[in-house]
Each structure stands twice: as structure tokens, then as C-alpha cells.
């Protein structure tokens, strides 16, 4: 219990939802506090293609200690950039509406994963971060994507008739999960077969589900 709660933040979003590599992105949110809002700060981190950073360190395989919690990955907190968010700034769709704060993220290369979070503080110095500390997603995110490329003589536009999924993860984690190396195959009949040991980001229909956990199905 606290007599002074941190600012209230809601309606967090980014426009466009799925930018191309030539587009800047506006991040906006509505922030209010009865004591007044001192500052709203955007923190963002660009994950280049092929360089995914999990928030947790997976256990080594094949003998996964399923009862031991995974350790935080110190690399997750590296590379974040802080930008002040401006109240009712002239930022596209975020320009209208009271108590709306926004900031601009410059363009990034195709297939970049851009994570972001927002730090809010009231005039009495009470701070909070969104997503909140008990939110397993840890951050908001968007995926920079120029669309399906042409493939084997097939136009990318025709391939869009099927749903497109992206699993963004470390190559080493993906290899350990599939366990083409027989020495890393998890024994049948153990709880380790059902343990979600690896992290990634799933992208579908323009929405990023970051810091999800996965395992090999068929245990």
C-alpha cells in the first residue's frame, strides 16, 4: 500500500503497427496523475536481424534442471536508448487527445525487432514502468518488415494468401531445441521433455508476442 500511486498509463501503441525499413515509428500513450506528471520517457532497444537477445538464459541440455529458475540474461538490459516523450506533440494520430505523450523512433533495417518500454514519474517523484514489473512480456515491441520477398520464381504477393508466422530466436537455441546433435536430445519420459526452455518472439498479423517460451513438440 502506498498513499501516492505512480501515474496511470494506458492506450500504449505504436504507429504504424508494422513499419517498413523506410518508416519512422511514433510511440504514444495516455498518462495522467492527480499530482501532475513530471516526465514520460521512452526507452527502446533495436535487435538487429539474427541477433535476438532472450531475457532469460536457457538451461543447458539434455539434463535440464526443471525445478531451478532460469537466470536473467544481463545482455537484455544493454543497448536501450532513452527519449523524452512530448505531451500532445504534433505526432500524427497522437496529436489529438488530452494527456497524450509521444516520441519518434527512427527507421530501422528490414526484419529488426524493436523493443520499447515507458518510464513514468509524477511531480512527487513516484516512478513506474510499463509494462509493469509483474508483466511477463517485459516490454512492448514491433517488427520492421518489408513484406514477403519473391521466392523460387513465385511472387511474394501470391504467398500472402497463407498466414505468415515469424519465430525470432537465437540460432544456437533453435539448434538445441531441435537437437539434431544426438548428444543434446532430451530423454523420453522425463519432465525435461515438457519444459519450455527457450525464449523467442512470435510475430503474427503485425503483432509481436515477445519473450515467449517454447519447446520441441512431440515429447
Label for each model-derived stretch:
Residues 77-83, 89-104, 110:
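Aromatic sugar-binding surface patches on proteins
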Residues 23-27, 38:
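Structural beta-strand segments of beta-rich domains
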Residues 12-16:
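Surface-exposed, proline-enriched loop/turn segments that connect beta strands in immunoglobulin-like
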Residues 26-32, 43, 104:
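Short edge beta-strand/loop segments characteristic of extracellular beta-sandwich folds
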Residues 32-56, 113:
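Solvent-exposed loop/turn segments flanking beta-strands in beta-repeat/beta-sandwich domains
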Residues 1-10:
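Proline/serine/threonine-rich low-complexity linkers at boundaries of modular beta-sandwich domains
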Residues 17-18, 26-30, 112-219:
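Phosphate-handling architecture centered on phosphoinositide signaling
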Amino acid at each position: 500500500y502506498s498513499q501516492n500511486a505512480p501515474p496511470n498509463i494506458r492506450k500504449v501503441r505504436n504507429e504504424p503497427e508494422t513499419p517498413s525499413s523506410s518508416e519512422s515509428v511514433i510511440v504514444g500513450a495516455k498518462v495522467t496523475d492527480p499530482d501532475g506528471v513530471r516526465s514520460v520517457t521512452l526507452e527502446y532497444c533495436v535487435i538487429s536481424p539474427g541477433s535476438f537477445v532472450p531475457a532469460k538464459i536457457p538451461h543447458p541440455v539434455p539434463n535440464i534442471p526443471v525445478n531451478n529458475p532460469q537466470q536473467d540474461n544481463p545482455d537484455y538490459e544493454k543497448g536501450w536508448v532513452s527519449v523524452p516523450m512530448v505531451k500532445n506533440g504534433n505526432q500524427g494520430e497522437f496529436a489529438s487527445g488530452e494527456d497524450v505523450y509521444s516520441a519518434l523512433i527512427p527507421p530501422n533495417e528490414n526484419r529488426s525487432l524493436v523493443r520499447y518500454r515507458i518510464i513514468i514519474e509524477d511531480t512527487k517523484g513516484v516512478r513506474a514502468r510499463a509494462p509493469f514489473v509483474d508483466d511477463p512480456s517485459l516490454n512492448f515491441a514491433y517488427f520492421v518488415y518489408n513484406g514477403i520477398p519473391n521466392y523460387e520464381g513465385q511472387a511474394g504477393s501470391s504467398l500472402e494468401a497463407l498466414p505468415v508466422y515469424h519465430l525470432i530466436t537465437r540460432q544456437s537455441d533453435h539448434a538445441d531445441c531441435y537437437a539434431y546433435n544426438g548428444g543434446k536430445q532430451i530423454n523420453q519420459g522425463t519432465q525435461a521433455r515438457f519444459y519450455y526452455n527457450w525464449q523467442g518472439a512470435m510475430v503474427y498479423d503485425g503483432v509481436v508476442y515477445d519473450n515467449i517460451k517454447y519447446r520441441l513438440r512431440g515429447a
